[in-house]
UniProtKB/Swiss-Prot annotation:
PROSITE patterns: IGP_DEHYDRATASE_1, IGP_DEHYDRATASE_2
Annotated gene: hisB
EC number of the protein: 4.2.1.19
Gene Ontology BP, a term: L-histidine biosynthetic process
Localization terms from the record: Cytoplasm
Gene Ontology CC: one annotated term: cytoplasm
Reaction(s) catalysed (UniProt annotation): D-erythro-1-(imidazol-4-yl)glycerol 3-phosphate = 3-(imidazol-4-yl)-2-oxopropyl phosphate + H2O
EC class (word): lyase
Pathway entry: Amino-acid biosynthesis; L-histidine biosynthesis; L-histidine from 5-phospho-alpha-D-ribose 1-diphosphate: step 6/9
Transmembrane segments: none
One example GO MF annotation: imidazoleglycerol-phosphate dehydratase activity
Protein's recorded name: Imidazoleglycerol-phosphate dehydratase
Pfam families: IGPD (PF00475)
Amino acid sequence: MRVAEVTRNTSETQIRVSLNLDGTGRQKLASGVPFLDHMLDQIARHGMFDLEVEATGDTHIDDHHTVEDVGITLGQAVARAIGDKKGITRYGHSYVPLDECLSRVVIDFSGRPGLEFHVPFTRARVGSFDVDLTIEFFRGFVNHAGVTLHIDNIRGINAHHQCETVFKAFGRALRMAVELDPRAANTIPSTKGTL
């Protein structure tokens, strides 16, 4: 089974992430940031990953450290669960609409961290959640999962819809990329022979 459990303890946050890449979308989320839990639920359900997240952090200051460190820890868990990358599809992409909003996410398990994030949020907050933290979550993820990730909100008016379509598309693209290809069961998906 492709599973991982990762803990991250700093002076700012204490985080545990448990992940099953071949799950059914079950989730148990307690990040301490309610809107982040809502977005993590999108990743789990649309990626069909079993995901548990427990986090405590210095949210009395703001949510920055918790959101970023959950992204870091999730990235580490994905990298650990994938292992040597043999047999994975490697690339994934998804378009997701929600009413007036449309977002696209493309991912490559290249081993080269890179993030292109183009989401022109229409307001600064969704409830109490600072939408600027969305890029911090994904930056933490890519740097520790070792992926190239392109995120584009093509259109949208409602900032909640912008966030939600991004996270749903991310879950679906991630699911596609980590899917095992039985035709390439024991091979690395690269002409270099390594990723």
